[in-house]
């Protein structure tokens, strides 16, 4: 039993090479009777650059320990995001968390990652090469990351939309061409 678990963990580590990015470190203080006890909080983004990404938060008395805890937390919270042609999003999407709002837009090849701060780290670890993103409201890294993840969880591939509607992918795309032709007339 234990041997199976170890073998599975080894296989997962070998198959999944993750890239991690440290987004934010915060020094926090706990006031106790004898003064202040300082600690550190870390926010880390982890991804495989093939459509899986997660974020984690870790706290500890030392910075490396906080980063390690955050990385482990991020690996446990991975989500899969469908990518178009392995380089961009399928459609434009909005997300929010608290007072932070983000707009993510699919972009043509060669655009690059046009996003600020924590959002850029999310896209780099996710494996997106072309995207335009804008954040509004809160510039707190935690809120920006959570708003970005909220938007990414609302991302649907044409295949999943077609399955939900009981259609074929080609029928979805033919409807889109008809609507585009009517709009230009």
UniProtKB/Swiss-Prot annotation:
PROSITE patterns from the UniProt entry: RIBOSOMAL_S5, S5_DSRBD
GO terms classed as biological process: translation
Start and end residues of each S5 DRBM domain: 18-81
UniProt key word Cell inner membrane: no
MF GO annotations: rRNA binding; structural constituent of ribosome
Sorted UniProt keywords: Ribonucleoprotein, Ribosomal protein, RNA-binding, rRNA-binding
InterPro entries to which the protein is assigned, alphabetical: Ribosomal_Su5_D2-typ_SF, Ribosomal_uS5, Ribosomal_uS5_bac-type, Ribosomal_uS5_C, Ribosomal_uS5_N, Ribosomal_uS5_N_CS, Ribsml_uS5_D2-typ_fold_subgr
Classification via Gene3D superfamilies: 3.30.160.20, 3.30.230.10
GO cellular component: small ribosomal subunit
PANTHER family per UniProt: MITOCHONDRIAL RIBOSOMAL PROTEIN S5
Job of this protein: With S4 and S12 plays an important role in translational accuracy.
Domain remark text: The N-terminal domain interacts with the head of the 30S subunit; the C-terminal domain interacts with the body and contacts protein S4. The interaction surface between S4 and S5 is involved in control of translational fidelity.
Family: Belongs to the universal ribosomal protein uS5 family.
Subunit composition and interactions: Part of the 30S ribosomal subunit. Contacts proteins S4 and S8.
Protein name (database record): Small ribosomal subunit protein uS5
Origin organism lineage: Bacteria, Pseudomonadati, Pseudomonadota, Alphaproteobacteria, Hyphomicrobiales
């Amino acid at each position: 039993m234990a041997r199976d678990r170890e073998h599975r963990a080894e296989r997962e580590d070998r198959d999944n090479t993750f890239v991690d990015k440290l987004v934010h470190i915060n020094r926090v203080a706990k006031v106790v009777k004898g003064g202040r006890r300082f600690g550190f909080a870390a926010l880390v983004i982890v991804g495989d650059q093939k459509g899986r990404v997660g974020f984690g938060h870790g706290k500890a008395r030392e910075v490396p320990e906080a980063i390690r805890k955050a990385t482990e937390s991020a690996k446990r919270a991975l989500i899969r995001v469908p990518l178009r042609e392995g380089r961009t999003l399928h459609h434009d999407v909005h997300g929010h968390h608290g007072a932070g709002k983000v707009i993510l837009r699919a972009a043509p090849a060669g655009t690059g990652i046009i996003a600020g701060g924590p959002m850029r780290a999310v896209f780099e670890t996710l494996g997106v090469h072309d995207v335009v993103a804008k954040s509004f409201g809160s510039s707190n890294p935690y809120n920006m990351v959570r708003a970005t993840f909220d938007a990414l969880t609302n991302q649907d591939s044409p295949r999943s939309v077609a399955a939900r509607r009981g259609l074929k992918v080609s029928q979805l795309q033919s409807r889109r061409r008809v609507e585009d032709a009517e709009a230009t007339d």
